[in-house]
Amino acid sequence: SRGIQDAVKARGLKVTFDVQNAQADQSNLANIAQRFVSQEYPLIFAVATPAAQTMANAAKNTPIVATAVTDYEAAKLVINKDKPGTNVTGSSDLNPIGAQLDLIMQFVPNAKTIGTIYNSSEINSQFQVEILKKELARYNVTLVEGTVSSVNDVQQVAQGLIGKIDALYVPTDNIIASAMPVLTKITTPAKVPVITGEEGPLHGGGLATVGVDYYELG
């Protein structure tokens, strides 16, 4: 949210922000949404798909600007990306998955199997993996998927991938991003390079990415 706050200040607009962080907890998110509605704020800015969906469900009559949402249509936030037809609009963080796959192949040119780990309940993650599958058609490479439903699953699922993959691709995924230190404690000793969908997970031990600048996106 820092990007939009700085942009508003740079334009000399007098706006007060009520910034809340749900800490990736859905119950916290629902409570924040209800409080925002009760406060009757004129506009809600939501970061990431879960936040945007929760705000949209709670605030039917309040304009909502979202960011860090990969696919607004798949998330059922808009009817059409060109003509939203709802009270939601915003910017997309769809990452250049084809370029990221090319990056993997530069690091591991003889790779035969690439793994990916993601939250199977997060629509954005599913969408990215489907694109990855299509991009893999350009290479003679097999994809092995590992899915989680919470941070607690990451260690076991990651361990299950080791020995089966030559590299690991991590899409933009809220659960995996928060569990990168756990993930890379497993991949690093196994010498499995981790290419990430965006910059944030690099600080948790990812090797490299070609991605979106989230500050500029805001």
What do the PLM-derived regions correspond to, one by one?
Residues 1-218:
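Short hydrophobic alpha-helices and adjacent helix-cap/hinge residues
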